[in-house]
């Protein structure tokens, strides 16, 4: 398993024109930047690729995929702060110090847009509607980050895992006849890291959820058969 540490000067893997065209129709950021001919980059991340932030970091916007934000201390201890999905942004936290820094890691294949802050500021000055959009977006980011903190603050590891699966199904789910497929390949070890548990506990809980038919597995991806029923199980615990 290789980690690819990315920085501002690296050569990113290009995204195909067909994918760009598809994303431009459904992503408001990309659509606006293309309309205004604003300079930006689009690149792909493979599973476990990492972006490390410094004070010169750009604004990054997720077009597709799922990433986790980590606070990394100089003793290599890591704290997961949030799970990011399509249309979320990151890079606007610039509080790195000599004690810690921030990084994001791709949980699966992801497509990300990056743009200089100076360009964003120029757009805000010339397009008031974009400024309103940006403020609303940052408020939603704050709400989502708070939601994630609520998830990992549950005393019950089972509740944490169920809440995380429901969150992922909401943002990365694909509707099927037998339920919602979480379109991510995430190991039990990574799930454990996200919610502050261990692989053995996660394996035990998932096995129990499979046995009680709340979820099933399809090619290493989780299917939630009835999200409402699963959330009721969570609320009744």
Swiss-Prot record:
Q: Which GO terms describe its molecular function?
A: DNA binding; DNA-binding transcription factor activity
Q: Spell out the SUPFAM superfamilies in the cross-references.
A: cAMP-binding domain-like (SSF51206), Winged helix' DNA-binding domain (SSF46785)
Compartments it resides in: Plastid, Chloroplast
Domain named HTH crp-type is located at: 155-228
A Pfam short name: cNMP_binding
Keywords per UniProt? Chloroplast, DNA-binding, Plastid, Transcription, Transcription regulation
InterPro entries assigned to the protein according to its UniProt record, in alphabetical order: cNMP-bd_dom (IPR000595), cNMP-bd_dom_sf (IPR018490), HTH_CRP (IPR012318), RmlC-like_jellyroll (IPR014710), Tscrpt_reg_HTH_Crp-type_CS (IPR018335), WH-like_DNA-bd_sf (IPR036388), WH_DNA-bd_sf (IPR036390)
Q: Which residues bind DNA?
A: 188-207
The Gene Ontology CC terms held by the record are: chloroplast
Q: Which Gene3D superfamilies match?
A: Jelly Rolls, Winged helix-like DNA-binding domain superfamily/Winged helix DNA-binding domain
CDD domains, sorted: CAP_ED, HTH_CRP
Q: What is this protein called?
A: Putative HTH-type transcriptional regulator ycf28
Q: Which organism is it from?
A: Porphyra purpurea (Red seaweed)
Gene assigned in the entry: ycf28
